[in-house]
């Protein structure tokens, strides 16, 4: 290598490195030929959490200089730090340095060509964007919002009751934003009185809360990712974690190395099935039949954990004599209203109001006996007839499940959207909840029901109540039937029905008042019911399907999309597109230039619209992404983990909290100048931050935790907290106005000792994956929920090798923080402390709107013409299907094939379509069909095919595969078609291919309780339209 001295210094730009090397006597050629400096040596390193799924893998971020934030100095006044490298964090106890293809490609997302860099405006009827300033954008949006609010705000309803609601502008909130941004968003929407509010959680895991909370007391994953390694048997039904959560699935593989078996029950032979011991191909939409068949098997063969069932479930409780189930209907059905009177779905009570029990389990009205009768119809023959799973294979799986009924073996269940996105999603999960209670697997390491969350903070944003009928901490938003604070609290606080139980929700008033003091400060007083009238009172359920309906009817005028790409996410894309075209204004807050922000643009066949006909004003506001902000997010296992800002945001992008705060500030000025509607409730909301236009994550995290507003003393007169100190635990909350907490579940996450969510002690003295020094897990840093159930009533472990808690004379804390009080061994206080009964519910009484026990109902679009169990009641009789959507129900004669949607490991919805590495890995839209169906339709691998449902069509490349088998269902052959969900009408410049939104095909009806859309089971046809 020959380089002159002059050229050498020119290359080095006269830099110190070159001159110093030369002065030391090195020849220019030798210096240039020397190994280059390690690229990370001078980088700024920060720790973060992956922004995709809720495995929440740890990341190390490296940037060119220290990013600016309010707590530290910037690298320089004229420079910005830029992210240039991401790798896995080897210290993280779940991911241990690993990243999946999505996480590995996240650098391309942060630095994507499709990042939104400055505010843009699309005028009504226009076909182009105009760049505008932040000042102009905020002023115009605030004006539109105030005008709509003033014209449509309802302070009092027709009965004269204060409701303070605004129902003509809605918001779809982000599930990847931090807890801190979520809390501020919650305050912002309640300040405005906005009631059309929802979150991505509703379109995915809505049924999780609706099923797990009535079953056990809380609606969250019961164990955690690492704990999966402790299982003897892993049932994967309703998910494909090897594909969708590959780094988390490593712990299932670890269990397999330890001798565990994996069984997959899924329509496809998927990635998880490829490492399983057994795979049962099942018809999509028939899971309840399979699982109720398992329950029948366990009860008939007596393979249940008897002591656990007797003491820790409601098996012994006597059910009302009026309860019955006949011909597909539970007692109390109202055909006109399509709902149930649930008064007979309850216990028998004695003269003291306590539930009656028969501990011998002999009484015919015992829950266990009613359950036996209910499942008696689910024979192996009926299981095969409805699900397509052969009897021999079904019984083999039942046998493996039954083996875990002994105290020293556990089974865990892993599920995700394959369970939830059905019209019977809640009851899918309930079926497995019953099984796990019968087997004694709840509360056990290696047991539980593990809901695998799909978005990085969908758990946290759900906890923060960003749902139609929610407040933080799973308290219900008041509705127009709630007349006062006292009436409301009485309605939502469960009564004691079994003596000596914890029934921790008895403290709901403390959670609510502390939240209201966080929201309204000195404006919330005992005299005004702690500001109860300030809160909006909902008049209906505003789920996403309803948002779209109201837009199409001209009743929803404005829509704010906060990191939610609705055009690609909501069902029946054409209906969503039609509704968006009728909006007066649309505000899109997103790091990326999403399809939703350009719904008005003609992209040809996949989005064939005329911009001139669309009069919606559209604002595209650039926001920061995960790498450009600090805060906390919550993984599937309820671990709250802090992440630090890794680089500066590009262009003029701003954090969500800044944008919301600026809009509030501008609207506040307009109200001061002009007056208007709902001013009192608007101004009552506190916004006491150091910089009101830009609240910091630290301020918000502390506000979320909560403070003492006065000196607090214990019952013995000892000082617990001085005024202004942060609280240590939710047991110290009070309902007298002396404490605050934005969310009672998170008290203890930031104390006077500091930020507990930033803890990074990954030691595991238990050997069971219980790293309580890492982050903070709600509630109270407990890592396994219902853990008292892992011991018998005398405190002896069911399995001494799986023991995380034990009695120490004062409490049950040991390797884990016990999910229990301080009652000693032998106490009759049950382990399910959030349940009024103190036990897990095999029979859900009146807690679930469509039945106290699961029952098989056909999908709305079914490949068979009947329900073999009860032909007069084919589908769930409580389903809500809007009149206009009934016209779009497809028949199996026109659309004979069952379609189901799913993810690929290389992509995350349509998000990664803006990430070059992920596009290169999976560039082209395809569909999967089985070999027999392909032969019938004359389709070969690589052919272009058209898939059509009653809602529309898409085109994609055919992948002919052995992974999909035809099934015999009720005497006919049923084929499945697999539809990956990741493509859309846009494509990153020069990379990948444009495609169609899979949601062009999906139906606009949802699960009966949460309205989560039925993405997983609907009918389509397929035809060849082009050669390979």
UniProtKB/Swiss-Prot annotation:
Its main location: periplasm. Binds 1 molybdenum-bis(molybdopterin guanine dinucleotide) (Mo-bis-MGD) cofactor per subunit. Its EC number is 1.17.1.9. InterPro entries: Asp_de-COase-like_dom_sf (IPR009010), Formate-DH-alph_fdnG (IPR006443), MoPterin_dinucl-bd_dom (IPR006657), Mopterin_OxRdtase (IPR006656), Mopterin_OxRdtase_4Fe-4S_dom (IPR006963), Mopterin_OxRdtase_prok_CS (IPR006655), MopterinOxRdtase_cofactor_BS (IPR027467), TAT_signal (IPR006311). One of its GO terms (biological process) is anaerobic respiration. Predicted to be exported by the Tat system. The position of the signal peptide cleavage has not been experimentally proven. Residues 43-114 form the 4Fe-4S Mo/W bis-MGD-type domain. SUPFAM superfamilies: ADC-like (SSF50692), Formate dehydrogenase/DMSO reductase, domains 1-3 (SSF53706). SMART domains: Molybdop_Fe4S4. One of its GO terms (molecular function) is formate dehydrogenase (quinone) activity. It is found in: Periplasm. It catalyses: formate + NAD(+) = CO2 + NADH. GO terms for cellular component: formate dehydrogenase complex; periplasmic space. Allows to use formate as major electron donor during anaerobic respiration. Subunit alpha possibly forms the active site. This is Formate dehydrogenase major subunit. It comes from Haemophilus influenzae (strain ATCC 51907 / DSM 11121 / KW20 / Rd). The lineage of its organism: Bacteria, Pseudomonadati, Pseudomonadota, Gammaproteobacteria, Pasteurellales.
